Design a protein with these regions (language model features):
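Short beta-strand/loop motif that positions the catalytic acidic residue
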Residues: 192, 198-200
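N-terminal cap/lid segment of alpha/beta-hydrolase-fold proteins
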Residues: 19-62
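Cap/lid segment of the alpha/beta-hydrolase catalytic domain
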Residues: 73-89, 99-119, 157-162, 286-290
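Alpha/beta-hydrolase active-site loop
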Residues: 113-135, 156
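Short alpha-helix in the alpha/beta-hydrolase fold that links the catalytic acid
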Residues: 82, 207-218, 242
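C-terminal catalytic histidine-bearing segment of alpha/beta-hydrolase fold enzymes
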Residues: 224-318
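Short beta-strand element of the alpha/beta-hydrolase
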Residues: 61-72
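Alpha/beta-hydrolase fold nucleophile elbow
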Residues: 137-148
Length: 318
């Protein structure tokens, strides 16, 4: 009986190890998009890891579509995993990127300088390059998703000048951004041909929905970007906890910035590029307040889960 038990445990462990694995890859630490576009070889090297999870019906002889996923400024939470599990149950592999833990950071709420959007976008492409070689991943069916800060990563991973600077041969086939910060508008509005969709709450004062609507409305008429604004929904509308105040977070409703072709976000007041932590804090501090509201709306959460499933099935499974 003991031998049989050991065999069962061994087989279970082998199955689990084949369906989920921790993967390391090389990235770096650019502070801004400008660092990637103009100084790609001057950045410090950084080892980053993530967890690759295969679909529930995993067969080691097959290849699967993949979603590379990024959490927000508070790191990974329960509601994020609900989406990943939903994708896995529908035949899609997921890769949970640990951009924060890889750099020894637990949260960037209220600062956004220890781990930046630029670092995470670079992580996304470096992860793509490695995972596209995996024997069970379909390199032509890789999408990206993220929440809040990770939503910004998802959105700007499609920005042409940045993508071309990192790897013009790598193409995400779908971008699903949850409540991203849309407060930066590039002078070059090139976001590629792959479908981009933004899900955001009407009442979001952390990453305001008005900014996303403004960005989408400025896009060229042939852009493949769309937007859903959920009524009566705050930031992190897909959390289970009710709305509450995040005292050290930023209220960004009054903040709008432009970004030049080199990837430098410009302080609108003085036309100064915010390419250092000090300048970024100064620029944001001049327009932002503290204490945004975040928390769940059960009805909206269910709508977002259903939309996410159908969006990814349409773009990764068809």
């Amino acid at each position: 009986m003991r031998v049989i038990t050991h065999i069962i445990l061994f087989l279970f462990a082998a199955l689990f190890s084949s369906a989920q694995e921790k993967i390391y890859f090389n990235s770096s630490n650019p502070f801004s998009f400008k660092d990637i576009i103009t100084n790609p070889n001057l950045q410090t090297n950084q080892t980053v890891y993530g967890v690759l999870t295969m679909p529930d019906d995993f067969d080691s002889t097959l290849v699967y579509p993949l979603i590379i996923a990024f959490a927000g400024s508070n790191g990974w939470s329960t509601h994020h995993y609900e989406y990943l599990e939903l994708y896995q149950s529908n035949g899609i592999a997921t890769f949970e990127v640990s951009s924060f833990k890889s750099r020894g950071v637990s949260s960037t709420v209220g600062s956004q300088v220890d781990v930046t959007t630029a670092m995470m976008v670079l992580d996304a492409y470096k992860a793509f390059e490695v995972l596209s070689l995996h024997k069970n991943i379909d390199k032509d069916k890789i999408g990206i998703t993220g929440w809040s800060l990770g939503g910004g990563v998802t959105l700007f991973s499609a920005w042409g000048p940045l993508k071309n600077a990192i790897n013009p041969d790598v193409h995400f086939v779908a971008h699903l951004a949850f409540y991203p910060p849309c407060i930066v508008v590039p002078t070059i509005l090139d976001f590629g041909e792959a479908p981009i969709h933004i899900l955001i709450g009407e009442l979001d004062n952390w990453t305001p929905s008005d900014a996303c609507l403004e960005l989408v409305n400025q896009m060229p008429i042939n852009s493949n970007i769309s937007l859903t604004i959920y009524p009566n929904a705050h930031h992190s509308f897909d959390r289970d906890a009710p709305p509450q105040i995040k005292s050290n977070g930023y209220i960004l409703e009054d903040c709008r910035f432009s970004m030049n072709e080199e990837g430098a976000v410009v302080m609108n007041f003085f036309n100064i590029p915010m390419v250092t932590p000090f300048l970024q804090k100064l620029g944001v501090g001049m327009c932002a307040k503290r204490g945004p509201t975040y928390g769940g709306n059960k009805e909206v959460k269910q709508k977002a889960l259903e939309f996410s499933k159908e969006f990814m099935k349409q773009n990764l499974l068809n």
